[in-house]
Amino acid sequence: MMHYTGTIWRPPYEASSLLLEVTVGCTHHRCKFCTLYADLPFRFRMSPLEDIEADLKEAQKMYRRVIGRKVSRIFLTGANPFVLKYDRLMEIAGLTHRYFPEAETIGSFARVTDVALKSDGELAALRGAGYDGLTIGVETADEEALRFMEKGYSAADILEQCRKLDQAGIEYYFVYMTEFRLYDRACGEGQGILECGEQRKGI
């Protein structure tokens, strides 16, 4: 059996991807609205490389003998696997290519702060190793809402780090909460309209 800890979350568009556990939980774990990893007895944990390799071996058997189709994409599970150091991510990519050489891309959830930890050269190398299609929960471009919900970054940070991804050729998808401020008493009524304007300016 493959290692899966707690509730496994993935975007709808990753339904056909091979789900590979490389982290469990979230390094930030302070967003006021989020309860996705509340069922875990710890905040964040990295999977041992031997567990990752064992899961790839198991998945190889399952896909080739039972499911009968090739794997074109692998999705790393956990709230933000992209926080892992460059060397670790490259090791994981090496393992995925060893057992699934046909896999074209590797995706994951990522925080804006995870991208900030990587240099431009490292991001380009990660793209070359197959990392592409990151899902980033930016939620909003409104500074007050970002602070209130304790996201841990600013709207300017979102733009800066996503430009780094653009330069590296790494695609990404945003998760937006379109009414993030609308029902927030601290921000006042009608702020959802204001927020949409701020998001348009950011985009």
Positions of the model-derived regions?
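Canonical Radical SAM [4Fe-4S] cluster-binding loop centered on the CxxxCxxC motif
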Residues: 5-54, 58
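Short, solvent-exposed loop/turn segments at secondary-structure boundaries
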Residues: 44-47, 85-87, 147-150, 184-189
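Aromatic/hydrophobic pocket-lining residues that form the small-molecule binding cavity
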Residues: 52, 89, 119, 158, ...
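Conserved SAM/AdoMet-binding glycine-rich loop
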Residues: 61-160, 166-167
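Short, electropositive alpha-helical surface patch
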Residues: 90-95, 185-202
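Conserved strand-turn element in the central/C-terminal portion of the radical SAM core barrel
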Residues: 113, 137, 141-147, 165-195
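Generic structural signal for hydrophobic
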Residues: 126, 165, 197-203
